[in-house]
Amino acid sequence: MHRTLSVRVAVLVALLVMAALLTGLAGCTPARDSMADVVEQDCLPGTACSKPIEIRIVLVTMFEIGEDEGDTAGEFQLWKERRGLSLRIPFPQSHHDLYLNPDTGVLGMVTGIGTAKSATATMALGLDPRFDLRKAYWLVAGIAGIDPADASIGSAVWSAHLVDGDLGHEIDAREMPKDWETGYFARYTRFPYDPDKPEPTGELFVTNIALRDWAFELTRNTPLPDLPGLAASRDKYTETEPARRPPFVLVGGHLAGMTFWHGEILNEWANRWVDYWTEGQSDFVTSAMEETGTFQAIEYLDRVGRVDRDRFMVLRAGSNYTMPPPGVGAAENLLAENEGYAGLQASVESLYLVGSVVIDELLRGWERYADVIPGDSRITPVSE
């Protein structure tokens, strides 16, 4: 009798334990037990996830060549292949799907070329209810034209002063007054480089300078690839020593515009235009087509608490020079570059190498950097 009762009690206890375990497993391990399942079933485009995906770093690239993997690399490919950006997240409201490393929280995007696409892609991501971007750092990593007076192709440039090259008045040079040196001048002014200019309303954006300086100090000694063929391109620039240096890391101003311009005259304009709007606080070093659109969207998103504008960084690497070497015409040089940028491979490698130093530091010290933006000189990098 006692033995039978003991057996029944033991069986009952075992059944209760098994039921509890099954209940617990049912509650803790849903059918969609992977991030991929969650994205596919619970995070459809245009809808909110049951729990937003927390992003630590948004990697902003502008274009890719061909496929995202396995062929000639544009701006996105090396990041996707080397940083485990393997989880595709459909993003039909923009130019290109997103790719996430669910283990690190690094999200890669390709905005498309030009300020219009970069602004709308950034806004689309910032307002996407699937993501929590409130503590995310943004790293723009793109190729650029580079001023031979400042650096060489393959060099990587951190920028905080972003000047727009589109907003303005313009008169054809053949119709401008004889005492003008250019037909392009600021809106609401009377002549080129009029000192009585209005406050910028899209002509100039300034990112977190302290964060820019922190990123530069962290990466300034990063060895950059000096690939075969670069020296031959550099050596043609006999009148500008920085253009002949092997690739290096520096800081400098950035000019963004929808027109791919080239030549000595426009290069001089770019230098004066950046100096004019920054009032001498920065010089022109790189030229591309997106930053003022991207950061305009960031500023709007910051106003509603979707992102933090102070966590935005710009890194550009020179794929080509913004003017030809001595003895070569502007049209001839531009058309040659259109056949393939001399520094494309070196520039995307430099972007990856330099940008990865910053990304690795942020991830390694996330417990700190989630709440404290680096840039305070009293903050020692976790890697030291």
Where are these regions (language model features)?
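Accessory terminal and edge-of-domain segments that mediate assembly/interaction
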Residues: 31-384
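Bacterial N-terminal signal peptides that target proteins for export
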Residues: 2-13
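Bacterial N-terminal signal peptides
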Residues: 11-24
